[in-house]
Amino acid sequence: MNLHQFRFVQEASRRNLNLTEAAKALHTSQPGVSKAIIELEEELGVEIFARHGKRLKRITEPGQHVLKSIEVIMREVGNLK
């Protein structure tokens, strides 16, 4: 679990679940964003995003809780700078 994964989840949420747009905004590759999110989901043992095939469809209920926690963590990290 790391801040990059948190940023990827946050940006995917901000970009209407569009991983390509999230990757562009973060200056990285879409497959890298997708892989990082999947790894975070596996580590946490929750599905953050519901998928249809490879596309993100919605944020799950557990995902909403994860996203809220990520937002708090990222805000606190920002306060350290």
Regions found by a protein language model. Give the residues of each.
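A short LG(V/I)-centered, amphipathic sequence patch enriched
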Residues: E41-I59
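The N-cap/first-turn positions of alpha helices
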Residues: N2-Q5, Q30, G63
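Short helix-boundary/capping micro-motifs
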Residues: A12-H27
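DNA major-groove recognition helices of helix-turn-helix
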Residues: V9, E39-L40
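Alpha-helical linker/hinge and terminal dimerization helices associated
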Residues: E43-L44, V66-K81
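Pre-recognition alpha-helix immediately N-terminal to the DNA-recognition helix
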Residues: R7-E11, H65, V72
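Hydrophobic two-helix hairpin corresponding to the core of helix-turn-helix DNA-binding domains
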Residues: V9-Q10, A22-A23, T60-G63
